[in-house]
Swiss-Prot record:
This is Probable protein kinase DDB_G0291133. It comes from Dictyostelium discoideum (Social amoeba). It is an enzyme of class 2 (transferase). Residues 757-766 have a biased composition (Basic and acidic residues). PANTHER family: EUKARYOTIC TRANSLATION INITIATION FACTOR 2-ALPHA KINASE EIF2-ALPHA KINASE -RELATED, MITOSIS INHIBITOR PROTEIN KINASE MIK1. Residues 578-590 have a biased composition (Acidic residues). Mg(2+) binds at residues 308, 321. ATP binds at residues 183-191, 206. It catalyses: L-seryl-[protein] + ATP = O-phospho-L-seryl-[protein] + ADP + H(+); L-threonyl-[protein] + ATP = O-phospho-L-threonyl-[protein] + ADP + H(+). The active site is at residue 303.
Amino acid sequence: MEPTYSIPSTPLKTPIRITVNNGHNSGQHSLSLSTCKPTPEQNAFNLNMFSEKKKNQYQTPKCPSPPLKSTPASRVNSNLPLIHHISSLSMFSPTTSLSDFMNCENGGSNNIDFSSSFGSSSLNSNNTLSINNNNNNNNNNGGYKIPSSVNKNSNNYNSNSNSNSSNNVISLFDKNFDVVCKLGSGSFSDVFKVKSKFDGNSYAIKQARHQFRGFQERERAVREVKAAVSLPPHTNVLQYYSSWEQNNTLFIQTELCENGSLQDFLDSLSPDQILSEELIWNFLLDVCLGIQHIHSYNMLHLDIKPENLFISSQGNIKIGDFGMAVKLETTNNNNNGNGGCQSNNTSMDSDCNNLSLDEDDIFFDFLEGDSRYLAYEFLLDKKQISKPSDIFSIGVTFFEMVTGNEMPTNGPLWEQLRSDKAIDFLEPGKYSDSLYQVILDMMKSNITERISLDQILLNENIQLVQQKRLNQFQNIDNIENDNNNNNNTDNNNNNNTDNINNDNNDDNNNNINNYNLKLITPYFQYQKERKDEELKEIIEFGEIREIKEKFEHHQFAIPTPHFVRSNAGRSSSSSLFSDEEEDDDDDDDSGRDSPIHFSLNNLNNSSSNIGISESNSNNSFSSILEENNESSSSSPLPSLSFSRRLSTSSLVTTISPKPNFNTSGNKLFSNENNNSNNNNNNNNNNQNNNNNNGFYGFTNNGSCNNLNNLNNLNSSGEFSNSSKKKLGKRGLPLLDVVNGGGNSGSKVCAIKRSFDSHPQESDKMSPRNLLSLFQETN
C-alpha cells in the first residue's frame, strides 16, 4: 500500500519533513517536500495550521500583509522579522561581554571577516547585535579572536540563551564602562563620555533615544553601523570601535573628541572674536580629506553639518554620524575618488544611477534629517544625488562659518541660497576673495558646475596649509635623524645623549599636529579666560544680591537701582507694558533681566549705579542691507545666539590671516567697497548727531537734569514732587493718566523724541518705528 502524505494548506518558508508510515517496518522515515509543486490548497490561509506551526521558530508561514503608510514599499519584507536587519550582522551571542572581545589575541583562522557578516539569513527576533571593527589599527593585536564560548558553526542563536537577554546586555555596558558625563543630545541619540574599566581609556558611546519603532529606524541604525565598519581608519574620520543592541536600542562606541563638535566651538565664540582665515582653510582641508576618503569607498555621507564635525585633541576635524550615509554600487566607478566628477562632472550620469537605495528611501530619511544643509537636487531630481551633494553641504557649512548666521530651514531665503545668490550675504573685506569664491563654487545650484574635491585641494591656499603641515613633520624627522647621528658619534657622552633623546621624544609627541594646535589653541584659551571671568561675575553678583536682599528687609533701607543684565532672546525694546498688575508681578525681575532703554547721561554721581546698555548694529547683516538701500528691519537671515553674532568693528583683537595667503584674484565686491565707504561716512555723521540727542531723543539739556537730585525720591522710588514726571515701566515717562472708556485710570506710556535737529525725519518714519514710539496697553 502506497504511503499517504499530509500536505499543509499553507506554504512555509523552510521545507518541512513529512513523516511517512511504512507498513513493512515499525520505524518511521521522513521525506522532503522541497521539490513539491504548490497546490491551490496552499494558497488558502488556514488559521489552525498557522497557530500550530507558529510554535516552531524555524517554520514561519508566508502570510503577506499590506505595508504601513509610513513605510516605502521597497522596504517591506513580510517574511522577515524586524530583528533580521540587525541580528545578521554578527555571530556573537548576547552572553558574550565586551571585555571578551577586547581581550582577544590573534587567532589565525578564527579572525572575523566582517565583509561577509552582512548576510541575508533571517535570525530569531530575540537576537542582539554586538560588532567590533577589525580595521582598527590602534590595537596592537591586529584582529579579534572569537571567544571559546561562541559556537562558530552555528548561524543562529540559541533561543534559550535569550530568555534573560535584557539583563545580559545591561551588564555588557555596566561591567565595562563608567559614565563620566553627558556630552550632548541630538534628534535621534544621546552621547556620553565613558571610561573603560578594561583599559582605562575614555570613549564616546552614542545611545539611541528611543527603541526601534519600525523598519525605518532599524535600517537607519544598521546603515550607520555598516558604514562605520566598512570604512578603514582615517585621520579625518571618527574611529569606530564596537556596537551592540540592548532592548531594541542601539549603542555605538567611538573614539572621544575632547573639544566637542564644530557647532559647539562656533557657539562658544564671543562677539569680539572672529575666526582667522588660516584656521578656516585648515578646517576646510580636514573636511575635504575626510570626504575624499569616504567617497573613495563609494559612499555618500549626505549629512555634513557643524554638529557632525568633531574637533579632536590634536585640533583636526573628524567626520562622524553616518546615519544618513548611503552606499554606491561598485560598477561603473571611474572616478577614483576625485569627488564625483571628471572634467567638471562629465561622468555624473553614470554615478547618479548607481545608488544602492531607491529614491523613496533617500527622501524618507531626509524628512528626518536637517534641511539647512540640503542640496537642491534632493527636491528637483533625486536621481542627481551623488558625490557633489556632499560638496554642497560643505559649502553651506563654511558659509555659515564665515557669516556667523544660522542657516534657514525653508522659505524664500532657503531657495535664495540655492539660486547662486549667496554672494549677497557675504561681508566685503572680512575674508579674502579666494575663500569666498571657493565657498560660492561649492554652493553652485547646477551640479555640473559645482567644484570638485580635487579642484579644492589644488587651491593655492590649501596647498600652503598642506606644505606647512609637511614641513612640520619633516622637522620632526630631522630631529630624529640628528639624534641618531649624535648617538653614533658621541659614544663617550651616553648620559647626555640619553637626556637629549628623552627631551626630543617628548617634543615629538607634543609637535605632532602642532600646526593645528597653534591655530586653535588661542581660541580655547580665550574661552577659558572668559568662562573664568563669567564665573567671577556670577559670584560677585550673588554677593551683591544677598546684600540687596538684606537691606530690603529693613525699613530704613535706601531703594537700590536695578541691575541691568542684557539677555539674548528677551522681548524687544518696543514692547512697552504699563498694566498695574504686570508692574506688581514683574517689578523685581524686569529691571534686572532687561536693559534700560534711555540715557541718563546727566546723572553725574549715579552713573556707576545704573547700567546703560548699548546696541551694536555691526553684529548682523544690517550693514550689508544698508549698502543695498534696503531696510535694516528686514534681516535676510535669522541671527544666531548672542555669542555667535560676529562683530566687524573689533578687528583689532582678532587673529588676522597670514600675509602670505592669497588675497588677490577677482574682486567680488569692487563696486560695493566704494559704496560701503560712503555709507560708513554717513553712518558716522548720523551717530554723532544721535549721541547729542541720547537714546530715544532725551536731550542732554532736557528734563533729565531734574534727576540730579536723588533726594527727591521717596521710599517707594518715586518723585516726591508732583510737578515732576514719574518714570513708568522700562524707564519710560508716564505722560498722562486718561480716565474714560470704562477703564478708569489707564496709563498711557509714550516716548518723547526730539525732532528739532532733524525735522525731515518724521516724513521717513515707517509704521514699525511709529509702533515702537507709541504703544498703549490696557
